[in-house]
Amino acid sequence: MNDKPQKFTEKRKASIGEGLEQLPGANDERFVTIFEHGSLLVEVYAPQGTDPQKPHTRDEAYIVARGTGEFVNGETRVSFEAGDFLFAAAGEAHRFENFTEDFAVWVLFYGPEGGEKQ
């Protein structure tokens, strides 16, 4: 684990490995911010055991980097694997369940508070 997380605000490339090297964080965080530009915030997220996240104030896209499991979004439950894309609109209750120990996702927060409206 690195003592000082690095954000790749000036780089044009980051790898899942670079994010995972910074986890867990100093306070046992399971996510790390690796890129910011305008409204876009990119994180690597790798929960262990359970996924404690709560609804977020911005739209959120996930790209599964590794592992398998189930994504629960409201009343909808879907299986996922590496390479899959998942989406949760701002304010929607969502979580990962039954995921493998190696599970990790790219997280992309974007747009205004309250999410984009169609």
Labelled PLM ranges:
Residues V42-E43, F71-N73:
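Short hydrophobic/aromatic-rich beta-strand segments that constitute the beta-sheet cores
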